[in-house]
């Protein structure tokens, strides 16, 4: 697409669980007056002379083992994120989940890269996949509607169902945390209707054969379902919780509160919820019979651990 400077390339017919190599080249279009009258400029590329090609591995089609890292509530603190993740060997993990509020608002492309994309590329994103789950702050700003261009999904929505081996992941979009009529949104929000539409999609997703036959079922939702009395939390709880309680969920990961929290399964929420703070990351290792979780803070200090059996 010669009229754009942002390119999303979809690779088809890749084999599951297979390592691929790639390099990037892009040639400038200086002028395009009409038809085939194109004047080209310089070509920029990844470093093809001094380093090996980038490598990535596609998700496996089968298997119960899975490992991933979760980051959330960075709010543009790219330097803090870099320091926090300095000792992580990202090559050991299947993906990195960005679970919302990586920016405080999204005003332009330059800010998006400055807030976390450039740091993510330097740390891992050239070779380890990102799964992006929008938080309430990423709905804000004049450039917010463009976020999906940088993190496209197969279904064209901010919520989706993903599968790694036989493990299913539900990425649920929380929308905003305050009523749509709040002065902060300037009359531009309609998240009650948006969440109702998402709820109907969720009902179909958990009824799908892919989800029902999964070896484990993991949910990512930026705002915790039991995260307080704000309007967004209440609306999410009223809509999503009755469906999730009947769906055999093994674990939910949330953020939003900027502090660690753990909510064991109970009669109201029938699955455990782990809430990550804004000064830590989560490492999750899944096997056929357990989920092992470590919450790691600055300096690589393990602050909390959890382990859950898979029934």
Question: Can you say where each PLM-predicted feature lies in the sequence?
Answer:
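Aromatic sugar-binding surface patches on proteins
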Residues: 2-8
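Active-site-proximal segments of metal-dependent phosphoesterases and phosphodiesterases across multiple
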Residues: 185-187, 191-193, 209-252
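Active-site neighborhood of phospho(di)ester-bond hydrolases with catalytic His/Asp-centered motifs
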Residues: 69-72, 95-101, 128-136, 218-222, ...
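Extended active-site neighborhood of metal-dependent phosphoesterases/phosphodiesterases
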Residues: 10, 24-55, 110-207, 239-245, ...
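Short, flexible loop/turn segments at beta-strand junctions in immunoglobulin-like
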Residues: 9-16
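Short beta-strand segments enriched for Tyr within beta-sheet-rich domains
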Residues: 16-26
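Active-site environment of divalent metal-dependent phosphoester hydrolases
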Residues: 76-81, 104-107, 134-143, 177-181, ...
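N-terminal active-site segment of His-dependent metallophosphoesterases
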Residues: 3, 26, 31-109
């Amino acid at each position: 697409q010669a009229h754009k400077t942002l390119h999303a390339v979809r690779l088809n017919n890749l084999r599951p669980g297979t390592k691929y190599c790639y390099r990037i080249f892009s040639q400038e279009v200086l002028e395009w007056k009409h038809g085939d009258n194109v004047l080209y400029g310089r070509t920029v590329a990844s470093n093809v002379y001094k380093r090996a090609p980038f490598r990535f591995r596609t998700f496996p089609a089968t298997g119960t083992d899975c490992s991933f890292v979760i980051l959330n509530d960075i709010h543009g603190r790219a330097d803090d994120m870099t320091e926090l993740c300095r000792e992580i060997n990202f090559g050991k993990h299947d993906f990195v989940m960005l679970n919302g509020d990586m920016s405080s608002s999204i005003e332009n492309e330059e800010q998006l890269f400055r807030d976390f994309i450039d740091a993510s590329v330097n740390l891992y994103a050239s070779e380890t996949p990102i799964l992006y789950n929008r938080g309430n702050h990423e709905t804000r700003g004049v450039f917010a509607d463009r976020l999906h261009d940088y993190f496209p999904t197969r279904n064209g929505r901010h919520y989706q169902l993903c599968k790694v081996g036989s493990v299913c992941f539900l990425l649920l979009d929380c929308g905003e945390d305050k009523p749509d009529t709040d002065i902060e949104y300037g009359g531009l929000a309609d998240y009650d209707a948006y969440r109702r539409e998402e709820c109907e999609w969720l009902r179909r997703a958990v009824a799908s054969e892919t989800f029902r036959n999964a070896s484990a079922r993991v949910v990512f939702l930026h705002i915790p379902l039991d995260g307080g009395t704000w309007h967004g939390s209440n609306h999410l709880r009223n809509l999503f919780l009755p469906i999730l309680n009947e769906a055999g969920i093994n674990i939910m990961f949330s953020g939003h509160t900027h502090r660690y929290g753990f909510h064991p399964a109970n009669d109201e929420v029938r699955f455990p919820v782990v809430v990550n703070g804004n000064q830590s990351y989560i490492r999750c290792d899944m096997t056929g019979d357990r989920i092992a979780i470590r919450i790691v803070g600055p300096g690589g200090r393990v602050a909390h651990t959890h382990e859950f059996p898979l029934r």
